[in-house]
Amino acid sequence: MPVFHTKTIESILDPVAQQVSRLVILHEEAEDGNAMPDLSRPVQVVSAAVANLVKVGRDTINSSDDKILRQDMPSALHRVEGASQLLEEASDMLRSDPYSGPARKKLIEGSRGILQGTSSLLLCFDESEVRKIIQECKRVLDYLAVAEVINTMEQLVQFLKDLSPCLSKVHREVGAREKELTHQVHSEILVRCLEQVKTLAPILICSMKVYIHIVEQQGRGAEEAAENRNYLAARMSDELQEIIRVLQLTTYDEDTSELDNLTVLKKLSNAISNKMEQANEWLSNPYALRGGVGEKALRQVIDNATEISERCLPQDSYPIRKLADEVTAMANTLCELRQEGKGQSPQAESLVRGIRDRMGELKSLVHQAVLGVDKAGVQQTAHTIQGRLEQAVKWLQHPEINDGGLGERAINLIVEEGRKVAEGCPGHQKAEIQQLCDEVERLKRQAAGSGPAAKQAAKQLTQKLYELKAAIQNALVNRIVQDFMDVSTPLKQFTEAVLQPEGTPGREQNFNQKSNNLQAFSDRASKTSRMVAAGGACGNKKIAEILLSSAAQVDSLTPQLISAGRIRMNYPGSKAADEHLQNLKQQYADTVLRMRTLCDQATDPADFIKTSEEHMQVYAKLCEDAIHARQPQKMVDNTSNIARLINRVLLVAKQEADNSEDPVFTERLNAAANRLERSLPAMVGDAKLVATNIADPAAAAAWKNSFQRLLGDVREVRDAIAPPQPPPLPTSLPPPIPELSALHLSNQNAERAPPRPPLPREGLAPVRPPPPETDDEDEGVFRTMPHANQPILIAARGLHQEVRQWSSKDNEIIAAAKRMAILMARLSELVLSDSRGSKRELIATAKKIAEASEDVTRLAKELARQCTDRRIRTNLLQVCERIPTIGTQLKILSTVKATMLGAQGSDEDREATEMLVGNAQNLMQSVKETVRAAEGASIKIRSDQTSNRLQWVRRQPWYQY
């Protein structure tokens, strides 16, 4: 079946598919009784092109040493040649009989063969090119595997000579490959991994120098240095393994995430396969000692298998875990025997055979477990609270639809996240979140069922879920303000402790204390980042993925940084030790800053500043307590915290100003930030005067005044970022109409006649109420829920549900997206149809969808050009740029499917349908994301573009007319 993971393949298949679609249309017209035209000329052109393609293919086979290519390509060449021959025969038959049925059958079979054979040839060649790149990656992995046995500078020099050209080649070839990929996500992963490999390589070499230096001196710290080296080599290996995994991918699901359970399982399974060879080599060597590369590979296989057992289906979990435990016990015994010099004993050899058999069985069980999760098709819960809330609300609004327990799982995860966040909150906030969690669980139990009470409980549950989400996000803003208030001091104090001269009193104790402080800060920061990834206000999948990745990196990097600090303490004169410490410090600082920036981006800046204000007031109260208690140091500490919060507010203000291209907004924000920056030294100066003369009431009064001015400047910054909104219109209902018995005329009006009604005027009809807004033409197909065996219609309905909340009047993006949803619903019918004209209409509908997708992309790009918010604009461009590629692929796949109509049921037909379904789902998801991004971008439009602004008007429900 056609795949389109590279731009080259897509550019070749698109014109071929266009020609085939014309032949399919001619075939349909002939079924209507029309004579087929003379096809000899176009068929001759196709035959010549096929002959040339076959010649190039055979030359490639003869010159290649790729066994898989030499095995797979001949069958693809044979298919293309056979298809070309069918076209020639059909052309000859039609020339003599333009109405020939057998000729038309050969024509459609030949068309199908040309398209699929060409695709197979291209894929065959492309896979061969990928294998070459993977071979280079594996060569680097082999070098990294021996990093642990490099013990002299001569060996290190040779290691570097061997590694450098391989690394350069990997960087060059993977860099060229990522530019060829059509799936943007795959390209981004390759770029990110390459950047990490490039950064880590010199740090690894430096760590190896440190290790060799310590070993040659027979000094202290060899274990820490070896651990540093192994950690860096393992990180580089992981990045290369991820490159290898992504290079082999040919499809992408827009709904998937790097955080999805199935994606994680596939990564773990891939890692097991890659480590198996090293593990078997270790088993085969009776002299291999404990702690070597091979044993570590074996242990990694067991760890990965155990993690898979925790993520797979229950029926697959126990056998994997049991087998992993058996291998662990046997490996421990084998290590002890080899350590005692009994590696060749009958017992050891028996253990080796047993471990090898079980490892093979474990690999097979892991493969089955991953397939089991894939086939089960259990829909993933979203990775953010916003996404989980949408899944839960969808279930609560339509409990009659079987969602496989997705909505209930989403609610459970929201509650679980709420309880996790509550643990780190102060008393009153903790109690509030825990109470909301309890109420959600209670209402969830009451909502089970279909009676009136259950429906009422479902409504209340929806409301409580929104309240819980808001409470979690408020708590997270609190954590971000507190935990990222000062990210530099723990690292700075740790560095100062490391650099203390030898012989300084309490040097070791000070180092231990500052190391513990650094570890505690890292733990807090990474925990907060994980919570923000799940519960942040932005709901951005990419930010969530990077936050989780950064948190894991900080967790693993902190112990290595502390070890590097200890080595530097032990060897103050070593240039290599100092350079290594600086390398890891830079890695750590960059990762923490990235975490802080992403947490800021995931938080509403106005909420952040408001929470910072509240914390400033708390610290100000503590300052007042310090003044009353005559504690100057407490005054200094709390003033420092206020200053840190002010600097964070200034940083957020600068980020918002740099992110905006609206001159009015940036001018107002920068002016407010400058005033705040000028106010800070005055407050700090007044606080110093108080600290030096804690009993002076005049100094205390001056400090209070300067703090209040500072607080006012903070509010001005907040107002500049998010101007205060006017009070909402009253939403209360009018007073109820009293009963007739309660009505009476007052004495004042008793004598007065009622007013006379106006005389009727001819020609004037009474004014009609405004008609309800109904841009629902052709939308009847979405009024009922599609069946589970209609995946394309389900995807189309999902897009329609997203866009129908907006009026398409004065909003071309919404109009185009609605048109796409309706066309996709029609495509869903045509895929299952085999009526006369269905092939022609299938191709025409796919073409219309592709044209509408180009309209959505064009309009989104126009909107992005007008958007003043750089982050929103980048996000909009990223999501909309995927659409044309998917639209082109839809045309090609629809042509393939059209050649299958009338021959349903074959494996090829099923595969074509599956690919078409996946493509349709990706297209609908991309358009849905584009609509959401476009709505956000419309809020931040240049002031000189207001006349062309898209109108985002929510459609009124019928009861508001």
UniProtKB/Swiss-Prot annotation:
Gene: Vinc
Keyword hit for Repeat: yes
Modified residues (Phosphothreonine): 774
Protein name, entry field: Vinculin
The keyword Ubl conjugation belongs to this UniProt entry's keyword annotation: no
GO annotation terms (biological process): cell adhesion
Membrane topology according to the record: Peripheral membrane protein
Bias kind Pro residues: ranges: 723-738
Region (Disordered): 720-778
